[in-house]
Amino acid sequence: VITKAGGSAAYGEWAAKKIKTRAGAQFATGVLGTVIFIDDYFNCLTVGTVMRPVTDKHHISRAKLAYLIDATAAPVCIIAPISSWAVAVGSTMESSGVADGMSTFIQTIPFNLYALLTIVMIIFICWTNLDFGPMAKFEHNAIYNNDLHSNPDHPQDIEEENSRIGNKGKVYDLIIPIVALIIFSILAMLYVGGLFT
């Protein structure tokens, strides 16, 4: 809906004036992925929709965008005390006999090395512009061939995707649906947690 209404394109034009470099676009993706920690699926959908126009402008491959999004989604959610994962893990601990599941969950955050090291790795990759393995092929193709979607071995047709993007939107076409989704997600978590009963 956001893409079809043109909200993503409008945000991309606005953000393009603020974000001037490839590293800046990558850092902005990582920061936004860290800030939206309500749920990992919500994070992926939101950050992908919002940052795709910005990363496209700076010739960052979709593969790297996907990596940046995925590497901030679940790791941030599992260490954020206010997330769907915190509620799930805390309640599972309590059903397993732990007296205070949420308190125990919070105490385990410093020991969640996977999540913490993944976030450190994102910062390192954005800062050093290090690409390796298949990611290096995708990035090379994005930078030198202006092909954000594929590597030279597997070209991809993108006409269908481009036909779905609206271009007459405003930034509020992006902000209003995302803010509404955040508010209703928090209310839904509070409702499921029993706050309103």
Label every model-predicted segment.
Residues 5-9, 18, 58, 95-96, ...:
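Membrane-interface elements of multi-pass transporters and channels
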Residues 26-30, 63-78, 166-178:
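Alpha-helical transmembrane segments and their helix-start/interface "positive-inside/aromatic belt" motifs
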Residues 118-197:
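Long, contiguous bundles of hydrophobic transmembrane helices that form the permeation core
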Residues 1-66:
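Membrane-embedded alpha-helical segments and adjacent helix-loop junctions characteristic
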Residues 33-52, 62-135:
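Alpha-helical transmembrane segments and, especially, the helix-loop junctions at the ends
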Residues 23, 108, 112, 167-171:
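Membrane-water interface of alpha-helical transmembrane segments
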Residues 11, 99-104, 194-197:
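Membrane-interface helix termini and inter-helical loops of multi-pass transporters
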